[in-house]
């Protein structure tokens, strides 16, 4: 019996190996369900999960998330899709000119935000903002990084 649990753990890792190329990104851009749906269509996205981020409230809920933005956690395979490609799709699915919400969703909970975990992601986010700004031919000052 003492060998059974380690055997099960070893087999589960072998059957479902850990993807060392998996990366995560957190994006806010209006209603999280809309953003979740659009990002799931991109090849290389493992999953997209809705939630809240950016606030101080512990355990925010749909009814009570003051100070938080509606966000999506994007888990992706960096061998199949790049962060710049994900951010390009992100900018095509939000209104980057509106920092006070998205479409009919208004307020801080719906403003566009790109959360980053390191300098590389920060640089990619700023480059994506610059590229979108050039494409639209207007400055994008309403995107929060």
Q: What are these language model-derived features?
A:
Residues 15-17:
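N-terminal signal peptide c-region/cleavage motif recognized by signal peptidases
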